[in-house]
């Protein structure tokens, strides 16, 4: 038999090949597990914000960067409009357009929509690779491979990176971990080269997502802790000063960011730590030149003077408005009740709600239990890099509890620390395995004081293997059932187990596009603005950007008012059509009736809506009901009438009266009414979307037609 010598590799080469194979499999798994939605439905954009991102990306790919940067969108926020180039983070769009043009350069003809659909899964594969390298810097390659495999399927990250989820977070998590990796390399080496690469990665992060504020506060916090623990060195000084100076200059090139890095409160911590670095370096220089007594006197004097000057200058700048205060979302992170009490538009967003305990297990499963193990290992073997990952883990744990959206920021560090924890447990017990045959064991070995060492080690390894397998099954199930359903196309199981598709949203937008005038203005709640603009190509009053609370409040006032009062508002805003989402027939719970109280709160939050009181829409016992016991104010408002018009004659379930709402589980209280100021224009197949046309003004005393 011929010996195949070329297959005989050295141990080092086998090790490298195995690592490459495992990492490649993790990257492929990361991409493929996010394709459930495409396989089950089709290549379609999900949710709401991604439709705006897709629309702007398409404009960039077709018109070029110059027109994109100077684009004024007259289809949004009528009659105000919106400047697109200066009000978005363009990293996502530029990345997609660049990939699109590169593929076309090589004559790979792919539609820009498909580039957008598959971008997040592609970057999740890149995230897997970066996670491996980052974890390797913290422990070793084994921990890195485990962390990479974990982040490939962790539901907390998949929720924002499935195929079709074309949002900023799809590439931002990759940018964030890349910045962290470069930062740790810069801290370890003290090299300007790595620090400059960290600044470039940070620039990419700034261009992609507003969450960059977390980075520019976490890195300075890391430096501050290193100072307080006596670990500050020349390496840290070079790394941070380079990252801060270069990163700040680069970040200011993003139009939406502008001068915020030197003017806003969110960035002042980074600037303050930069100043502390200079003071620390100067103090070290003086210490080397003066005797201890002279240094002590000078040090106290300088610190007192500098501290007083900084506090005075900072207070003056904030009082005069030179340094802008924290934004509402930032206040909400520090005080979870702030948005609920002061800014209802922020509190109304579901992803801004506090996280429930069950969400942690649902999105992280095994990682919840292995995270403390990895944290313990890092505390037991402290280094500059491990202090950073500890701080990342602790801070992201807090922020994820305040806002469910930030589970996305927590998921990567959970994978990293869990990978370290699992790796440490397996390494510890692997050493206790005895793979020699029992009959060849020496008597000395058999009489050991730890006779069942091998059995305990085998048991622990099997337990860890079982938990890792259940984690994989759980993650795959959550991905398939919870995070792979595009909100634009809904599905349900029929009585015979078959899948029923509800395509009402696209049906309604298609009708709007082809059956309404080009200059028609559509009023809907802000959730659906991006979809209407992108798919129906019609002008809308408010959308998901939510930059003008007064304008949104005006729409809320119209929805919460009687027909007569609402008609005045609609004529004032030049509304042609009104669109509402209604789930009473199909059982769709995310409809406008369930969102209605937020319309009331936001509508009543401005001066023009002071007459709208939330308590008026409750029963005397404090209940929100749509049946006969419901508040008369609710039963006669515009939103109620648009949703339930003609619904009183519809049978929704067997043995139930007509007009039975399957979401609220109640027979509606106001059935027999007609619309005075609106006329029904279109209702989709399953009544999910209802469109009404606003009647013209009275003509010399005649009724509206």
From Swiss-Prot:
It catalyses: a di-trans,poly-cis-dolichyl diphosphooligosaccharide + L-asparaginyl-[protein] = N(4)-(oligosaccharide-(1->4)-N-acetyl-beta-D-glucosaminyl-(1->4)-N-acetyl-beta-D-glucosaminyl)-L-asparaginyl-[protein] + a di-trans,poly-cis-dolichyl diphosphate + H(+). It comes from Mus musculus. Component of the oligosaccharyltransferase (OST) complex. There are 2 OST complexes, OST-A and OST-B, which contain STT3A or STT3B as catalytic subunit, respectively. OST-A and OST-B contain common core subunits RPN1, RPN2, OST48, OST4, DAD1 and TMEM258, and OST-A contains DC2/OSTC and KRTCAP2/KCP2 specific accessory subunits. OST-A complex assembly occurs through the formation of 3 subcomplexes. Subcomplex 1 contains RPN1 and TMEM258, subcomplex 2 contains the OST-A-specific subunits STT3A, DC2/OSTC, and KCP2 as well as the core subunit OST4, and subcomplex 3 contains RPN2, DAD1, and OST48. The chain crosses the membrane at residues 18-38, 120-138, 141-158, 170-189, 192-206, 212-228, 234-259, 268-287, 301-321, 357-379, 386-402, 407-428, 454-473. Its EC number is 2.4.99.18. The record marks 49, 351, 595 as: Interacts with target acceptor peptide in protein substrate. The record marks 160 as: Important for catalytic activity. One of its GO terms (molecular function) is dolichyl-diphosphooligosaccharide-protein glycotransferase activity. A motif (WWDYG motif) lies at residues 525-529. The gene is Stt3a. Pathway: Protein modification; protein glycosylation. Glycans are attached at residues 537, 544, 548. This is Dolichyl-diphosphooligosaccharide--protein glycosyltransferase subunit STT3A. It comes from the Eukaryota.
């Amino acid at each position: 038999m011929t010996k195949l010598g070329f297959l005989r590799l050295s141990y080092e080469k086998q090790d490298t090949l195995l690592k490459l194979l495992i990492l490649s499999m993790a990257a492929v798994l990361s991409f493929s597990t996010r394709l459930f939605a495409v396989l089950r439905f089709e290549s379609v954009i999900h949710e709401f914000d991604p439709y705006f991102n897709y629309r702007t990306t398409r404009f960039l790919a077709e018109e070029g960067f110059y027109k994109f940067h100077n684009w004024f969108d007259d289809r949004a926020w009528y009659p105000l409009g919106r400047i697109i180039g200066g009000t978005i983070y363009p990293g996502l769009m530029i990345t997609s357009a660049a990939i699109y043009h590169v593929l076309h350069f090589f004559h790979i003809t792919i539609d820009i929509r498909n580039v957008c659909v598959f971008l997040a899964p592609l970057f999740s594969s890149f995230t897997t690779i970066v996670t491996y390298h980052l974890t390797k810097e913290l422990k070793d390659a084994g921990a890195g491979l485990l962390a990479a495999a974990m982040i490939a399927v962790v539901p907390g990250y998949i929720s924002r990176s499935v195929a079709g989820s074309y949002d900023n977070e799809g590439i931002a998590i990759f940018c964030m971990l890349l910045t962290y990796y470069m930062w740790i390399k810069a801290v370890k080496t003290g090299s300007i080269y790595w620090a400059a690469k960290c600044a470039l990665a940070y620039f990419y992060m700034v261009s992609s997502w507003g969450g960059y504020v977390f980075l520019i506060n976490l890195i300075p916090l890391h430096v501050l802790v290193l100072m307080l623990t006596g670990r500050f060195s020349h390496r840290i000084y070079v790394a941070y000063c380079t990252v801060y100076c270069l990163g700040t200059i680069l970040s200011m090139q993003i139009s939406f960011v502008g001068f915020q890095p030197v003017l806003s409160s969110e960035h002042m911590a980074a600037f303050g730590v930069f100043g502390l670095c200079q003071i620390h370096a100067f103090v070290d220089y003086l210490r080397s030149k003066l005797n201890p007594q002279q240094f002590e006197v000078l040090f106290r004097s300088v610190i007192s003077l500098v501290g007083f000057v900084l506090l005075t200058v900072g207070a003056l700048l904030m009082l005069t408005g030179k340094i802008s205060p924290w934004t509402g979302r930032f206040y909400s992170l520090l005080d979870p009740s702030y948005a609920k009490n002061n800014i209802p538009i922020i509190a109304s967003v579901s992803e801004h709600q506090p996280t429930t305990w069950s969400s942690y297990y649902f999105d992280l499963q095994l990682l919840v239990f292995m995270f403390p193990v990895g944290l313990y290992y890092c505390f037991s073997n402290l280094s500059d890099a491990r202090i950073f990952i500890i701080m990342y883990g602790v801070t992201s744990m807090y922020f994820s509890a305040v806002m469910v959206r930030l589970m996305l920021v927590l998921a990567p560090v959970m994978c990293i620390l869990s990978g370290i924890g699992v790796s440490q447990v397996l390494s510890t017990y692997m050493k206790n395995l005895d793979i020699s045959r029992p009959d060849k064991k020496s008597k000395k070995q058999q009489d050991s004081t730890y006779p069942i060492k091998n059995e305990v080690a085998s048991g622990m390894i099997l337990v860890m293997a079982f938990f890792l397998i259940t984690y994989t099954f759980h993650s795959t199930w959550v991905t398939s059932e919870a995070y792979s359903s595009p909100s634009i196309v809904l599905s349900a199981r029929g009585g015979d187990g078959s899948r029923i598709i509800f395509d009402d949203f696209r049906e309604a937008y298609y009708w709007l596009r082809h059956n309404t005038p080009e200059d028609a203005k559509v009023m809907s709640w802000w959730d659906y603005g991006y979809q209407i603009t992108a798919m129906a190509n019609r002008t809308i009053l408010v959308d998901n950007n939510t930059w003008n609370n007064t304008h949104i409040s005006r729409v809320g006032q119209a929805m919460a008012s009687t027909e007569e009062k609402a008609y005045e508002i609609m004529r004032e805003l030049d509304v042609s059509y009104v669109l509402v989402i209604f789930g009473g027939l199909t059982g769709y719970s995310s409809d406008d009736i369930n969102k209605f109280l937020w319309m009331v709160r936001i509508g009543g939050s401005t001066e023009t809506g002071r007459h709208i009181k939330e308590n008026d829409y409750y029963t005397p016992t404090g209940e929100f009901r749509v049946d006969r016991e419901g508040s008369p104010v609710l039963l006669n408002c515009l939103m109620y009438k648009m949703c339930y018009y003609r619904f009183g004659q519809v049978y929704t379930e067997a043995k139930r009266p007509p007009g039975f709402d399957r979401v609220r589980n109640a027979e509606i209280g106001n059935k027999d009414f007609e619309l005075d100021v609106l006329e029904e224009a279109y209702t989709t197949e399953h009544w999910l979307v209802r469109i009404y046309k606003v009647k013209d003004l009275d003509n010399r005393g005649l009724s509206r037609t």
